[in-house]
Amino acid sequence: MIVISNTNIIYSCFYKPEGVIATILKNRKNKLQFIAPSYLLDEIEEHLPQIMKKNQLTKRQAKTLLKEFTKNITFYDLEDIKRENRDKAVKIVKEIDPDDYLFIALHLEKGHKIWTCDFELINGLKRKGTISVLLQEN
């Protein structure tokens, strides 16, 4: 099974580096395959100072953990996703969380479920009834 990892899945790994989510992501023998838009890395970088502060990590430690958590994820650049899917995704999430449009666009492009623990996104997509989501409790 292939799943699209949402950014908050990676965030949760910093707070529980030995937790279920981090263990699943780090397992190379996993039957799950992970994909994500490369925007996920940009979003993590943007919030890295807060992550470092809350978890008492140096920049080097945070970067090492990020590499470990994302080593089994295949990333897709913006250009890898058709414009029509990006445009449709923008419309779907405009009232939920516009920052999540690339995850939705990748879902529209590839057809895989989105793995997330973002309840705002989950509930918003459920109301629209258009996107398959895998809920992950922290």
Predicted regions and their residues:
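Active-site neighborhoods of divalent-metal-dependent phosphate/nucleic-acid chemistry enzymes
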Residues: 74-119
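Short amphipathic alpha-helical segments and helix-helix/interface helices
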Residues: 21-25, 63-66, 103-104, 122
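Short, well-structured N-terminal submotif of metal-dependent ribonuclease cores
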Residues: 1-36
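Residue-level signal for well-ordered alpha-helical positions
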Residues: 16-17, 47, 127-128
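Acidic, PIN/NYN-like endoribonuclease modules and their adjacent C-terminal/linker elements
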Residues: 36, 104, 108-138
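A generic structural signal for short hydrophobic patches within well-formed alpha-helices
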Residues: 10, 41, 121-122
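PIN-domain endoribonuclease scaffold, especially VapC-family toxins
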Residues: 27-31, 35-87
